[in-house]
């Protein structure tokens, strides 16, 4: 990790209650193995929570939104452990879950500060005829689950997929990004 302290104090300090609205932690692979159905697009370096918190404190960032990395698939353990450590007063989270995840699991996630579900598809995924249509049942089911909890949907995917999903996105009954 870059030794930010060797560089001295930052030229600009974040204002009080500043929030990093999208960051990810990567734990030791032996404890948090990558779980991707496809080969990983990149090999994430270990990026533990203490290193990030140290940098955030140096910059004056007090609050955080954890976003589930695609490298972990639907295994949110690393992120949820980090959220437990930080505490609900300082963080929120966006998970990747199967549309049929048990209500009790979602309730536990909500209690930790989770407020959204991420639908992850590789941003470099080649266009496949009918793929966006095949996603619609999952999107609608996750939309319903999010609506029950007051959560939002977060999408990661290639531009062609976003373009094909625009009519669906416009009709969602939950916020999305």
Question: In which residue ranges do the predicted regions lie?
Answer:
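Mid-domain alpha/beta scaffold segments of enzyme catalytic cores
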Residues: 2-149
């Amino acid at each position: 990790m870059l030794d930010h302290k060797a560089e001295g104090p930052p030229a600009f300090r974040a204002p009080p209650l500043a929030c990093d609205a999208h960051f990810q932690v990567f734990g030791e692979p032996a404890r948090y193995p990558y779980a991707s159905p496809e080969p990983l697009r990149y090999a994430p370096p270990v990026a533990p929570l203490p290193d990030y918190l140290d940098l955030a404190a140096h910059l004056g960032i007090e609050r955080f939104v954890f976003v589930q990395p695609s490298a972990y698939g639907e295994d949110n353990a690393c992120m949820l452990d980090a959220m437990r450590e930080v505490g609900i007063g300082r963080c929120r989270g966006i998970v990747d879950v199967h549309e049929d995840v048990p209500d009790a699991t979602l309730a536990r996630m909500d209690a930790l500060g989770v407020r959204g579900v991420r639908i992850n598809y590789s941003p470099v995924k080649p266009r496949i005829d009918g793929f966006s249509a095949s996603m619609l049942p999952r999107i609608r089911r996750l939309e319903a689950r999010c609506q029950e909890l007051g959560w939002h949907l977060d999408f990661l995917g290639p531009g062609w997929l976003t373009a094909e999903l625009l009519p669906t996105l416009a009709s969602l009954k939950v916020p999305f990004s």
